[in-house]
Amino acid sequence: MSILKLKPSCKDYLWGGHRLVEEYGKEYEGEILAETWELSCHPDGPTVIVNGPSAGKTLQQYIEENGKEVLGKNCRRFRDFPILTKFIDARENLSIQVHPDNRYALKNEGQYGKTEMWYVMDAGEDAFLYYGFQKEIGKEEFAKRIQEDTLLEVLHAVPVQKGDVLFIESGTIHAIGKDILIAEI
């Protein structure tokens, strides 16, 4: 089996920038490039093979045609390919998010949950992200803070710099701040 070269799926969310094209040579015709999904079988952005006899097929098609064995013996236990690797160029702040765990996501969304690992490829001088709560709050306070747009006041603002690595376990409230370039697994 030869090495597969993949073409990423490109995402143009409003908060994205230009660095993935200008500094990392990603091919994209749009004005804003927020994310490239480098290794993906996700239906919203599959990567496409660009070399060899499987050129033009998605990674998912390749796996279906050649069997899960091409991924190694441990992948046989997964229903779907369980990894999504992406580069994120956050020119602006991202929304606050909480991702479900596998049990909830498989039952309610039909796909795996999302625990993330971030490697900060680059960051501005005052760059930070939000990670978890400063203190425990109840459902009522949570709802009130969302309504009043004060939720950020009770989240940890974590300064980041190039080379930092962060583990974001599913169920953890988080958000990427502006002026950060991240590799996410």
Task: Mark where each language-model region is.
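Transition-metal
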Residues: 1-137
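Active-site glycine-rich loop that binds ribose-phosphate moieties when present
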Residues: 137-167
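A short hydrophobic beta-strand segment most commonly corresponding to one strand
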Residues: 116-118, 175-185
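Conserved metal-binding segment of the jelly-roll/cupin
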Residues: 96-99, 159-178
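Gly/lys/ser-thr-rich phosphate-binding loops in alpha/beta enzymes
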Residues: 14-19, 84, 155-164, 175
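A short secondary-structure junction signal
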Residues: 108, 129-132, 142, 177-181
